[in-house]
Amino acid sequence: MKKPKIFLALDTNKISEAKRIIAYGKSSKLDIGYKFGLEFFYAKGSREFISKVKGKKIFLDLKLNDIPATCSAAIRSLKDIKNINYITLHANAGEETIKAVVKSAKKTNSKIRLLLVTVLTSISNSSIKKIGHTKSIKELVKKQALLAKACGCHGIVCAGTDLKSVKKIFKGEIVTPAIRLKGDSAGDQKRVIGPKEAFKNGSTALVMGRSITKGNIKKNISRLIKELK
């Protein structure tokens, strides 16, 4: 049986905190990798630090969202970080950009797997209408999943609340953020889900930040393992 795949979100701009999370974020019962987002990537020394992380899957969550030439060039500029396994780009960038990034990634580093970010987990149905969308989040995410498939992305990033409908039409990797352990606050997230339910509904990997990295990491990982049983 495969170990549950968990990406710990290193949501910090301090290398010392990243080291703490990596040092304590271990378990023989989980397949743990590390997600580096914009906050860490913009910090001094981040590229060198990321390039030296060994033995774990590296997920670079940049959510690229620009014109084709710019996003393609951004991928090429990452060629010195050879241990990257996943990079995200945003569905809002559009078909031309997505296809250009897929092409650029193949040339730059063939082991990079591209994940298309669908509707952010901090967005609700009411807030999505304010930015001009007339469809429900579920319908929009389904269209974005089909776009990912058509453009050659390896997977998508999708809220747990949309998993059931997406799983029927998308067979690639589905990474789910906004995961909360029982009793934990949702914080700024609007569409959260528990880890066991996420895997049950079709997620292939989870991104977990605050529920694991805040406080006693070892104890929080034990809580996660218990919930997954």
For every predicted segment, state its role.
Residues 84-94, 181, 191-221:
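Glycine-rich phosphate-binding active-site loops on the catalytic face of alpha/beta enzymes
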Residues 1-27:
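N-terminal glycine-rich anion-binding loop in soluble enzyme alpha/beta folds
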Residues 5-10, 32-36, 58-62, 85-89, ...:
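Hydrophobic faces of well-ordered beta-strands that scaffold small-molecule active sites
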